[in-house]
Curated annotation (Swiss-Prot):
This is UPF0422 protein lpp3030. Residues 1-19 form the signal peptide. Residues 20-66 form a coiled coil. Residues 63-79 have a biased composition (Low complexity). Residues 50-81 are annotated as: Disordered. The keyword Coiled coil applies. Keywords: Coiled coil, Signal. Belongs to the UPF0422 family.
Length: 530
């Protein structure tokens, strides 16, 4: 009897609960019925549209059969609209990596239909470098604009190979349209110094280096590249901003596919592969000032298909100097090595049949009507000089977060005294640098320091110091930027030393005299890269 009462009480209490559940189920059933009715209505509309489309298509086909279209012209309706081509519907898919996107470097994105790229999700591939989602370094050091100006064609060819390998790795067909990559930089800088030939402290604020790079990978084998750079040098006459102009810094076409062959070809306006000129400093090393040569060569090269191994380049171009034969050539040889991902580096050497076309030989920066201004100067120079051979030896090694750079470059024969002189004799200019660097984290940001020593010999006429002690601190406070501060101590040639160079016909340049003094310069720079 007692249990019957308990059961009766539970039944009375649970009846409202079941009633509520029944009401919820009825509401859910009604909502699903409304959705089903809406879907059925949509299906009926689509079937009606499909029937109308088939009827219209049959009518057009009958008209076309009765009255064929004229050759070489599309059939049209009475209204003049072109008849649509037959088509079919296909599934559109996007390949996604199995791993989390943060764990891989490349993840190109495209819409695929019938195993063909219909379109890239971002439209035609115009991307900011590095190519297609390659995760860049925090300081922007791996952007195209920061690739070494020497052998930039080889570096882009390697990048192009990594790009197309990424497509194959994730299962995408090779794009049938050019992939255009944009890169660039702006580097405003401020300097404070006390020059050799002045007792007053001087200072300047300038835009510094600014450049826009465009690399177009047409396919796996061919790439075109142009770099447009800002000319920061002040004009000879008028306000300094009057020379705020852009010019073609580099432009070339590279043909090669390292997956198929170690051979490649490059032609255009580039820095010839002579020297390395690697430095972490704000100021260019004296080796670069002396011998880096920009011209319009053809280059035939060899690059090991592995990341390490030998490389070679043979090149030729027409010289700017006019005495003797116009042709100049050279060779660059080297080897890239790496051991257990801890030690890596490069050793190499080069030879060029004339160093007179180098930027530091063509323009020394002297004022108009004063000392030797370079062979290319209209008022203080002359291109009618003998071609003088030069050589280069360089090495770079990195271990963990430390790196060491060594380089020597110089003429292997003397210039004629009337072309370039030192103490009344034909000059044989040389330059060398040694630089030690270390990377670390500062304030939770990537940073580096570097110290170096540089020297020159018989380069007084080129306005280069005899010795240089230099140090720099770099830090990336914000992504894709590098903030730098540099101290430089230059020592001039002695008081008893003098030099000169070729002058226009009938004129003589003022001699460049050593001062025996030293100069100190502090530079601050903000580099912004994309």
């Amino acid at each position: 009897m007692k249990f019957k009462k308990i059961i009766l009480a539970l039944a009375c209490l649970s009846s409202p609960l079941y009633a509520d559940q029944d009401q919820q189920l009825k509401s859910e059933i009604q909502r699903l019925q409304h959705q089903a009715e809406d879907l059925q209505a949509q299906l009926n509309r689509l079937q009606k549209q499909l029937a109308n489309h088939k009827s219209s298509q049959q009518k057009h086909e009958q008209q076309a059969a009765a009255k064929p279209a004229e050759p070489k012209s599309k059939p049209t309706t009475k209204s003049g609209a072109a008849i649509e081509e037959k088509y079919h519907s296909s599934k559109v898919e996007v390949h996604a990596p199995d791993a989390h996107p943060e764990s891989i470097s490349f993840y190109p994105t495209a819409l695929i239909a019938d195993n063909r790229v219909v379109t890239y999700i971002a439209g035609t591939p115009v991307v900011s470098s590095p190519f297609l989602g390659d995760r860049p370094a925090f300081d922007g050091s791996d952007y195209i604009v920061n690739i070494s100006s020497i052998n930039r064609d080889v570096r882009l060819m390697q990048q192009r190979r990594r790009l197309y390998r990424a497509y194959q790795k994730i299962g995408y067909p090779i794009p049938n349209m050019p992939i255009i990559s944009l890169s660039g930089k702006t580097e405003p800088a401020a300097t404070f110094n006390n020059p050799f030939r002045s007792t007053n402290t001087d200072g300047d604020i300038t835009l510094g280096s600014s450049e826009l790079d465009i690399a177009a990978a047409l396919n796996e084998n061919v790439e075109a590249y142009i770099a447009i750079a800002y000319d920061e040098s002040p004009p000879a006459i008028g306000p300094r901003v009057n020379n705020s102009a852009f010019n073609l810094n580099m432009g070339f076409v590279n043909i090669g596919n390292l997956d198929k062959s170690p051979l490649y070809f490059t032609a255009g306006q580039v820095y010839v592969p002579f020297g390395r000129y690697s430095s972490a400093m704000v100021s260019a090393p004296v080796t670069m000032n002396l011998a880096r040569t920009k011209t319009r060569p053809v280059i035939f090269g060899y690059k090991s298909q592995a990341d390490t191994g030998p490389f070679a380049a043979f090149y030729g171009y027409r010289s700017d100097t006019t005495l003797g034969r116009s042709g100049v050539g050279g060779v660059n040889l080297g080897y890239i090595f790496g051991f257990d991902n801890d030690i890596n580096g490069e050793i190499g050497g080069g030879f060029i049949t004339s160093v007179a076309d180098a930027g530091g030989m063509q323009s020394t920066g002297s004022n108009v009507g004063t000392t030797f201004g370079g062979f290319g100067s209209i008022t203080n120079g002359n291109e009618n000089v003998r071609k003088t051979k030069a050589a280069d030896v360089h090495g770079h090694v990195g271990y963990d977060r430390y790196n060491l750079t060594l380089e020597w470059v110089g003429a292997v024969q003397s210039f004629r005294p009337q072309d370039l002189s030192f103490n009344g004799q034909g000059a044989r200019p040389q330059a060398a640098q040694a630089e030690l660097g270390m990377t670390f984290m500062a304030f939770n940001r990537p940073a580096s320091i570097g110290v170096g020593y540089q020297w020159t010999k018989e380069a007084l006429a080129l306005n280069l110091p005899k010795q240089r002690y230099i140090g720099v601190f770099n830090i990336s406070i914000w992504k894709d930027t590098v903030e730098s501060i540099e101290y430089r101590h230059d020592i001039d040639y002695g008081l008893t030393q003098f030099a000169n160079g070729a002058a226009p016909p009938g004129l003589v340049n003022l001699p460049t005299l050593g001062t025996g003094k030293s100069a100190d310069t502090v530079s601050a720079q903000i580099g912004v890269f994309f």
